[in-house]
């Protein structure tokens, strides 16, 4: 049976087109996906991301567990509230999921994982946690909102009690804190996001969600669907699990080598394979593409390079650039001239560094 967030009726009342996303009925847009995209780049938008899975980890051995479980190093997390992006790998070095981990106390960490991977993530984490006597708690009592855009932080802080505003305004990137709502319920506010814009992601009790959503809409924040969330994240150069990487792809093959820490004394799952890949290189790579001709890059399209064939992973029309952009996985090596097969035509594309857009600004290499 399809799942619904606490805001399902609210989305429908706002005219949202609802679709099935990983077993959840979610808004794809509220009228115009392109208008929603531009509003986040220029102002502030709010996303219902309550389909994401929140997992709390409790116990004196949580940090040793995470040193084993994650390819990035939780030893970086020393200040309560600090967050880290990491891949969780299988023994073959493939990506089980990408996630954000928060350090709350030495005996208390928090994961935010993808909706599509909920069941396998929980099974894998529980299996690994048993050896460390760590309690794994799924927080189904919490909803999650993302408020993103250049005006997002101001719109959120203006709704908070004055006693909390200063701390929230000073919150650094990839950091979180807990504050009390006007009804004395706890809001977990994190300066993170999936759009390439500044803003907050907020975990809050289910029963508080509609009130906060409506309060933000009254300030001029617009509701944004998952369609614009996808074009925003692709412009920002952010991977989508299941499309840009999966259990057959290592971080080095998904342009996520920067998330791998081969620090001494930490034998994380999949490390041996990644060490070999680091030494010997990988046979395939993920690259960014931009197409100057009219048309759209789509998942699965064949990509032709001097080294051989690959395929488009994520592809879309970029509202900010007014051109088609995408990620492709192709054979390793300098791609040189690249073409994409679209309806039996070989269309030239340019290889560009990503992100394509950061905080509303086209990156300087895009139109070189």
Curated annotation (Swiss-Prot):
Its EC number is 2.1.2.10. It comes from the Bacteria. It is an enzyme of class 2 (transferase). It holds the Pfam family GCV_T_C. Belongs to the GcvT family. The glycine cleavage system catalyzes the degradation of glycine. The glycine cleavage system is composed of four proteins: P, T, L and H. NCBIfam families: gcvT, PRK00389.1. This is Aminomethyltransferase. It comes from Xylella fastidiosa (strain 9a5c).
């Amino acid at each position: 049976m399809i799942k619904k967030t606490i805001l399902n009726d609210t989305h429908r009342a706002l005219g949202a087109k609802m679709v099935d996303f990983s077993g959840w009925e979610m808004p794809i847009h509220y009228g115009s996906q392109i208008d929603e995209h531009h509003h986040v780049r220029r102002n502030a938008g709010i996303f219902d991301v309550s389909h994401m899975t929140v997992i709390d980890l409790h116990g004196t051995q949580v940090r040793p567990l995470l040193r084993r479980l994650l390819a990035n190093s939780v030893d970086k997390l020393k200040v309560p509230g600090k967050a880290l992006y990491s891949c969780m790998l299988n023994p073959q070095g493939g990506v089980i999921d990408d996630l954000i981990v928060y350090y709350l106390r030495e005996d208390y960490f928090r994961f935010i994982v993808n909706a599509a991977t909920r069941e396998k993530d929980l099974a894998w984490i529980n299996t690994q946690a048993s050896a460390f006597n760590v309690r794994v708690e799924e927080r189904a009592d919490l909803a999650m909102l993302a408020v993103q855009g250049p005006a997002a932080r101001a719109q959120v802080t203006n709704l908070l009690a004055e006693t909390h505003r200063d701390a929230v305004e000073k919150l650094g990137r990839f950091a979180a804190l807990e504050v009390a709502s006007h009804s004395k319920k706890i809001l977990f506010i994190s300066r993170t996001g999936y759009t390439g814009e500044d803003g907050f992601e907020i975990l809050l009790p289910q029963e508080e969600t509609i009130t906060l959503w409506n309060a933000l809409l009254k300030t001029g924040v617009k509701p944004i669907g998952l369609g614009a969330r996808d074009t925003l994240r692709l412009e920002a150069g952010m991977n989508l699990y299941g499309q840009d990487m999966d259990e057959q792809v290592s971080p080095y093959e998904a342009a996520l080598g920067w998330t791998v820490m081969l620090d001494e004394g930490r034998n994380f799952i999949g490390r041996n394979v990644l060490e070999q890949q680091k030494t010997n290189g990988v046979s395939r790579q993920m690259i960014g593409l931009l197409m100057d001709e009219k048309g759209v890059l789509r998942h699965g399209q064949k990509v032709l390079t001097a080294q051989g064939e690959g395929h488009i992973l994520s592809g879309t029309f970029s509202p900010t650039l007014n051109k088609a952009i995408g990620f492709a996985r192709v054979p390793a090596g300098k791609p040189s001239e690249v073409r994409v097969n679209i309806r039996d035509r070989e269309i030239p594309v340019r290889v560009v560094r990503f992100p394509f857009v950061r905080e509303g600004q086209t990156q300087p290499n895009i139109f070189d």
